[in-house]
């Protein structure tokens, strides 16, 4: 049923190795920082892997414009950063699960 002699033990060992790799990858992801931009780079927002905002950079030329436009640019830059961190997380986790034979559409618990 489990591939013969030692099959279940081997399966458990692989599961433990996978869990260790996933934990390490999650720790690495938490340390990641990405920067999202809007307004052709005039507004930049940097967030970490936990989606916490680390830094906001605003080009001085925007401080003379209206407040509403600046708020929109900051929101757009944050959304861009969030999209980028999600993509990076998916890529890193895909590398961890690459050796697993998962059914199509299976979602990992992270």
Swiss-Prot record:
Keywords assigned: Cytoplasm, DNA-binding
GO molecular function: DNA binding
Locations listed in the record: Cytoplasm, Nucleoid
Region (Disordered): 1-22
SUPFAM superfamilies, per the entry: YbaB-like (SSF82607)
Family matches, as Pfam families: YbaB_DNA_bd (PF02575)
Database matches in Gene3D superfamilies: Nucleoid-associated protein YbaB-like domain
InterPro entries in UniProt: YbaB-like_sf, YbaB/EbfC
GO CC terms of this entry: bacterial nucleoid; cytosol
Main subcellular location of this protein, as a coarse class: cytoplasm
Record family assignment: Belongs to the YbaB/EbfC family.
Assembly and oligomerization: Homodimer.
Name of the protein described by the UniProt record: Nucleoid-associated protein KPK_4227
Taxonomy of the source species: Bacteria, Pseudomonadati, Pseudomonadota, Gammaproteobacteria, Enterobacterales
């Amino acid at each position: 049923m489990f591939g013969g002699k030692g099959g279940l033990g081997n399966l458990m060992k692989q599961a433990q190795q996978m869990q260790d790799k996933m934990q390490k990858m999650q720790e690495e992801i938490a340390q990641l920082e990405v920067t999202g931009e809007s307004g052709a780079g005039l507004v930049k927002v940097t967030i970490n892997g936990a989606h916490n905002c680390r830094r906001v950079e605003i080009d001085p030329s925007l401080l003379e414009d209206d407040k509403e436009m600046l708020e929109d640019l900051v929101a757009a830059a944050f959304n861009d950063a969030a999209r980028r961190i999600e993509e990076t997380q998916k890529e890193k986790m895909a590398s961890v699960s690459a050796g697993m034979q998962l059914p199509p559409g299976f979602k990992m618990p992270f």
